[in-house]
Amino acid sequence: MEQKPSTLDPLSEPEDTRWLDGKRKRKSSQCLVKSSMSGYIPSYLDKDEQCVVCGDKATGYHYRCITCEGCKGFFRRTIQKNLHPTYSCKYDGCCVIDKITRNQCQLCRFKKCISVGMAMDLVLDDSKRVAKRKLIEENRERRRKEEMIKSLQHRPSPSAEEWELIHVVTEAHRSTNAQGSHWKQKRKFLPEDIGQSPMASMPDGDKVDLEAFSEFTKIITPAITRVVDFAKKLPMFSELPCEDQIILLKGCCMEIMSLRAAVRYDPESETLTLSGEMAVKREQLKNGGLGVVSDAIFDLGKSLSAFNLDDTEVALLQAVLLMSSDRTGLICVDKIEKCQETYLLAFEHYINYRKHNIPHFWPKLLMKVTDLRMIGACHASRFLHMKVECPTELFPPLFLEVFEDQEV
């Protein structure tokens, strides 16, 4: 005999009962969600303050009265669309308005809105509402600018000690930067026929124009010498052991030379001026041995042209690149790191003093340090290919001394 399922077993509930129960649960959960999403209540309202129109929970001061969102919206729509002349009441305007009955009689609800003091003249039409919103946005933007100016005013400028350091670094750069501010007048353009006829094939598919490569090697030795002279003029660098000085110089040399070329990018002729004297186009530098490194330096030059860097900012960038404590084989890592931090802090304070108009200027400028480090790493890899493909006699001794045995 088949046993009937027990009515106490929850699994044996009739299907329609389970469906109704599920519906009730969904409705209950929806109510919980709705209640948890209730709007912001201003601090000037007492706890559980009621709407003066219907008695529901008030959300703020609307049209001169404390009301709920529902009555606020009803009153606004009525005035904006001029609906009140169309309202009527089945009970001679004697309805009691509360949160249950408020939607049953529009006329009595509107009359109560007026009787409790809601002001019709405070309801804006579409054009006034747009104008008000625009005014709010303008005020917001004005406050934002005022706060930004205030924050800029409170950013520290360099201290007396930092100004002294900044002066030393700037002079070190100026005295070792070929042609100085007169580079445009003194530069000579590399003839266009040089660097356009690649001869030696490189392993990565690029080719080297040996004539262009030969031209570049003529200016590389004095360019390297000037970077070394710049470093020696910095007191913090001179205090380091010779072994660390050599590692730091080998690590930063290409980065600093690239920076010095990049800040001499000319958008009109689309050239970089190398070592303050030789203006070259992108393809010439690329075919002359640098390959994709050429693209990176030109791209850096184009982006830096918007920064309008002065000599001091270029000098401090070089000092930060020089004092990189993550170079392999260093002895005085902590000391070098502290030196770089000193330069960075003076640099940041100088940026505050300069008051550039570019938003977030300081972090954007620091990103260029990363770009220059990447250029240095790419050149180290490229140098290995050049050594294989180009005749050894074309490499100046100082060029080999600096770039050989670099970590790739």
UniProtKB/Swiss-Prot annotation:
List ligand-binding residues for 3,3',5-triiodo-L-thyronine: R226, S275
For this chain, the annotated S-S bridges are none
Which Pfam families has this protein been placed in?
Hormone_recep, zf-C4
What are the boundaries of the region Disordered?
1-22
User: Where located?
Assistant: Nucleus
Answer yes or no on keyword Nucleus: yes
- What are the entry keywords? DNA-binding, Metal-binding, Nucleus, Phosphoprotein, Proto-oncogene, Receptor, Transcription, Transcription regulation, Zinc, Zinc-finger
Q: Where does Zn(2+) 2 bind?
A: C89, C95, C105, C108
Tell me the residues on which Phosphoserine occurs.
S12, S28
Q: Which residues bind DNA?
A: 51-125
GO CC field: cytosol; nucleus; RNA polymerase II transcription regulator complex
Q: Where is the NR LBD domain?
A: 161-405
> Which stretches of the protein fold into NR C4-type zinc fingers, per the record?
51-71, 89-113
**Which processes are annotated in GO (biological process)?**
cell differentiation; mRNA transcription by RNA polymerase II; negative regulation of RNA polymerase II transcription preinitiation complex assembly; negative regulation of transcription by RNA polymerase II; positive regulation of thyroid hormone receptor signaling pathway; positive regulation of transcription by RNA polymerase II; retinoic acid receptor signaling pathway; thyroid hormone receptor signaling pathway
- InterPro entries, alphabetized: NHR-like_dom_sf (IPR035500), Nucl_hrmn_rcpt_lig-bd (IPR000536), Nuclear_hormone_rcpt_NR1 (IPR050234), Nuclear_hrmn_rcpt (IPR001723), ThyrH_rcpt (IPR001728), Znf_hrmn_rcpt (IPR001628), Znf_NHR/GATA (IPR013088)
Could you give the subunit structure recorded for this chain? Probably interacts with SFPQ.
Q: What is known of its domains?
A: Composed of three domains: a modulating N-terminal domain, a DNA-binding domain and a C-terminal ligand-binding domain.
Q: Which family does it belong to?
A: Belongs to the nuclear hormone receptor family. NR1 subfamily.
Q: What is this protein called?
A: Thyroid hormone receptor alpha
Its gene is THRA
